[in-house]
């Protein structure tokens, strides 16, 4: 038997499809999401409706974004969910969540079992819409969740950690074994909750500058910041901000990255593109 087939659908490798089938895990995720009628619930990658059904049961209306044409068609003819669903057969990476929130008249509650092959770039896409999002609950590769929640001075701490924590409060919810999926992925999974900050703990004047600094620092994470960020900051400027030029990217806190971004935004602002 082909272990990539689930409920008559062949999992497509190019879409990174692994279908959740463990009822205990499904119940735990739905409980963590706690969907309520009247909320603007949006599911990314509903697949074979493992989460869509139990979430949809609690709602009058649910929006789903599904790239796979066959799966989107199955949802349209779903026996009891069909009338409740608004289906966008589209890539979530190009979806305008801000427009949807405006249309629905409230911030979105976004959830999904995300395809692991796009999870990190999709996170960055969603971060650009945090003003339009109330919260997010995602099943991700455990290693990605570890990176999202990591603090300074750890191997998992990187650009994703800094940017996620700049935008959101990040809370791990539960770990999920490969056996909970068809076909089983080769890695462990985990569920994470991301709640955009109501008030930014470390506001920056230009988030593009923060993105640039973190990219340059972590692209050369073994170098000291004296070297990796030498084109942006002199040793005198670093020490003036209370930063040791001998530190590496992974030693610098989110607050310190934001401090650096604000210095640069004031003293060497990026030109509008």
From Swiss-Prot:
Record's catalysed reaction(s): adenosine(1518)/adenosine(1519) in 16S rRNA + 4 S-adenosyl-L-methionine = N(6)-dimethyladenosine(1518)/N(6)-dimethyladenosine(1519) in 16S rRNA + 4 S-adenosyl-L-homocysteine + 4 H(+)
Record function comment: Specifically dimethylates two adjacent adenosines (A1518 and A1519) in the loop of a conserved hairpin near the 3'-end of 16S rRNA in the 30S particle. May play a critical role in biogenesis of 30S subunits.
Binding site for S-adenosyl-L-methionine: 18, 20, 45, 66, 91, 113
SUPFAM superfamilies given in the database record: S-adenosyl-L-methionine-dependent methyltransferases
Keyword Cell inner membrane in record: no
Pfam family, one: RrnaAD
GO molecular function: 16S rRNA (adenine(1518)-N(6)/adenine(1519)-N(6))-dimethyltransferase activity; RNA binding
UniProt-annotated location(s): Cytoplasm
Protein family (similarity comment): Belongs to the class I-like SAM-binding methyltransferase superfamily. rRNA adenine N(6)-methyltransferase family. RsmA subfamily.
The protein, known as: Ribosomal RNA small subunit methyltransferase A
Primary site of residence: cytoplasm
The protein's Enzyme Commission number: 2.1.1.182
Keywords per UniProt: Cytoplasm, Methyltransferase, RNA-binding, rRNA processing, S-adenosyl-L-methionine, Transferase
Gene behind the chain: rsmA
Originating species: Shigella boydii serotype 18 (strain CDC 3083-94 / BS512)
Keyword rRNA-binding found: no
GO cellular component: cytosol
């Amino acid at each position: 038997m082909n272990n990539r087939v689930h409920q008559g659908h062949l999992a497509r490798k190019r879409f990174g499809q692994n279908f959740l089938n463990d009822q205990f895990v499904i119940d735990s995720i739905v409980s963590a999401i706690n969907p309520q009628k009247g909320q603007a619930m949006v599911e990314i990658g509903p697949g074979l409706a493992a989460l869509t059904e139990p979430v949809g049961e609690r709602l009058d209306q649910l929006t789903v974004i599904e790239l796979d044409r066959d799966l989107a068609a199955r949802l349209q003819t779903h026996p009891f969910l069909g009338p409740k669903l608004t289906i966008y057969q589209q890539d979530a990476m190009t979806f305008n969540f801000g427009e949807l929130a405006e249309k629905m008249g409230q911030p979105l509650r976004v959830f999904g079992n995300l395809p692991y092959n796009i999870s990190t770039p999709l996170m960055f896409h969603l971060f650009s819409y945090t003003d339009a999002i109330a919260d997010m609950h995602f099943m991700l590769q455990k290693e990605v969740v570890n990176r999202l929640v990591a603090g300074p001075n750890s191997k998992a701490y990187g650009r994703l950690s800094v940017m996620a924590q700049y935008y959101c409060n990040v809370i791990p919810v539960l770990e999920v074994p490969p056996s909970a999926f068809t076909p089983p992925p080769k890695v462990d999974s985990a569920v994470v909750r991301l709640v955009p900050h109501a008030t930014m703990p470390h506001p920056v004047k230009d988030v593009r500058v923060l993105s640039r600094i973190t990219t340059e620092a972590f692209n050369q994470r073994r170098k000291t910041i004296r070297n990796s960020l030498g084109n942006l900051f002199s040793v005198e400027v670093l020490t003036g901000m209370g930063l040791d030029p001998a530190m590496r990217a992974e030693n610098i806190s989110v607050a310190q990255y934001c401090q650096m971004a604000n210095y640069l935004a004031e003293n060497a602002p990026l030109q509008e593109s």
